[in-house]
Swiss-Prot record:
The keyword Ribosomal protein applies. GO terms for cellular component: cytosolic large ribosomal subunit. One of its GO terms (biological process) is translation. Pfam families: Ribosomal_L27. InterPro entries: Ribosomal_bL27, Ribosomal_bL27_CS. Residues 1-20 are annotated as: Disordered. The lineage of its organism: Bacteria, Pseudomonadati, Pseudomonadota, Gammaproteobacteria, Enterobacterales. This is Large ribosomal subunit protein bL27. Keywords: Ribonucleoprotein, Ribosomal protein. The gene is rpmA. The keyword DNA repair does not apply. Belongs to the bacterial ribosomal protein bL27 family. One of its GO terms (molecular function) is structural constituent of ribosome.
C-alpha cells in the first residue's frame, strides 16, 4: 500500500496587495484639472504651480495644461507644476 501521510501546512505564502504607486502622467503630457499625476507615500515629489496635494500625498492637477517636472531649492527638491497650454 503506497500511501503518504499528509504533510504539515506552511506558515509562509502571504504578501500584501500592491498599492499601484508611482508617476501616472509624465513630463510634457497634457492633463485635465483633477487628473492624478503621482501617487506616492510621503512627499518624494512636491506640489508646484497649479498642482494640489491630497491627504495621502497624491499630487493632482488643479488646471488643464502640461505636466512639468523641475528640481528647485537648496535641498534639490523635485516639484511638479502645470504649464498652461
Amino acid at each position: 500500500m503506497a500511501h503518504k501521510k499528509a504533510g504539515g501546512s506552511t506558515r509562509n505564502g502571504r504578501d500584501s496587495e500592491s498599492k499601484r504607486l508611482g508617476v501616472k502622467r509624465f513630463g510634457g503630457e497634457a492633463v485635465l484639472a483633477g487628473s492624478i499625476i503621482v501617487r506616492q507615500r510621503g512627499t518624494k515629489f512636491h506640489a508646484g504651480i497649479d498642482v494640489g496635494c491630497g491627504k495621502d500625498h497624491t499630487l493632482f492637477a488643479l488646471k488643464d495644461g502640461k505636466v512639468k517636472f523641475e528640481v528647485k531649492g537648496p535641498k534639490n527638491r523635485k516639484f511638479i507644476s502645470i504649464e498652461a497650454e
